[in-house]
Amino acid sequence: MGRNPLIIGITGRIASGKDAASKIISNKYGFYEISADKLGHLVLHEKKEELVKIFGQKILNTRNEIDRLLIRNLVFNDNKELKKLESISHPIIFNKIKKILIQNQSTKIIINAALLFKINLEKLCDYIIVVKAKAPIIKNRLSYSMPSIDSNIINKILEIQKDIFFKKNIINLKIINIINNKNYAYLEKEIEKKMQEIINYERFE
């Protein structure tokens, strides 16, 4: 892009450890973190009227606000509804992130996005870190972090996210995999190794 010193994208399925990895990189290596998930929440607020027209009043809570749990359950049970939501939210999220990059051109950036490839954010990145974990481990983590979430919803989320790492015609992009089937200390050590690889590569570029 001819802009920021270094832009790393980080992606992974739900409960893979993606968010923890992003925070480690942000805090330890001085990267400014952009959360696509948080921007997605903002889009729900900004596009409330349009979304209510499409999905109906059933996505609103008692305060007449869009309820993320209600809309999540709706779209994860209907692929057509999911595509409608993505067609509205993804271009806006992409443009918001691009704007943040322009506003922070002297800063190292990490873009934290589960749907990084679906939103086309790989176009903005120098490197992409993919955090992976086995499905049983993901489910076990979710049983602790989100005990109220329905197991059927978990299975549908994992099914939807199974191909989030694959995209044709990715060229000139350095993709780094981290397998996170263990604990936080192990994840930290893996990140240290991978970040050292990036630092060494950048040094000799």
Swiss-Prot record:
One of its GO terms (biological process) is coenzyme A biosynthetic process. It catalyses: 3'-dephospho-CoA + ATP = ADP + CoA + H(+). It is found in: Cytoplasm. Residues 7-205 form the DPCK domain. Pathway: Cofactor biosynthesis; coenzyme A biosynthesis; CoA from (R)-pantothenate: step 5/5. InterPro entries: Depp_CoAkinase (IPR001977), P-loop_NTPase (IPR027417). It holds the Pfam family CoaE. One of its GO terms (cellular component) is cytoplasm. Gene3D superfamilies: P-loop containing nucleotide triphosphate hydrolases. ATP binds at residues 15-20. GO terms for molecular function: ATP binding; dephospho-CoA kinase activity. Its EC number is 2.7.1.24. Keywords: ATP-binding, Coenzyme A biosynthesis, Cytoplasm, Kinase, Nucleotide-binding, Transferase. Its main location: cytoplasm. Catalyzes the phosphorylation of the 3'-hydroxyl group of dephosphocoenzyme A to form coenzyme A. PANTHER family: BIFUNCTIONAL COENZYME A SYNTHASE-RELATED, DEPHOSPHO-COA KINASE-RELATED. HAMAP family: Dephospho_CoA_kinase. Belongs to the CoaE family. This is Dephospho-CoA kinase. The gene is coaE.
